[in-house]
Amino acid sequence: GEELCQEVSKMGITLPHPERTWFGEPEAKRRQEFLNQASEFELDSPFHQSPNETKAECLWRRYGEEAFELLEMIRQDFSLSEPLFPEAENLLCEIHLIAKKEMIVSLADLLRRRTRLALLFHHDFLKNSKNLKEAASIIFGKQTENQWSEYF
């Protein structure tokens, strides 16, 4: 919300009560606390496709307060700070959080709505991604093969 207010203000539009906290958006000091902690895990570098936003900023934008859970996962297993695959803008810890918090009904739901991977990568690339299949197994468990064959 704050970023939106800044952009709208740049257009010369005066906002009533721009200092108000947006619904659901944590205070700026919580964001800064997250960014400080995230830098300990080398999340202050950008994804290669998004040079204007660090991994930490991206995680905060996507998850808000829940991003602290991602840091805790990384604290317990640093390998979860790695991207799903080098070209992806989703970290392995996100897959674990998605599996824990969201009701993913299909592989299409995961690839189109939750991660946007289907919108960013060729179908065959995704189909042949071992890492993606492993991520799907975290979410779908015993239903992974059914989900995989249904989507691909």
State where each predicted segment sits:
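C-terminal accessory subdomains/tails of enzymes that are appended
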Residues: 1-152
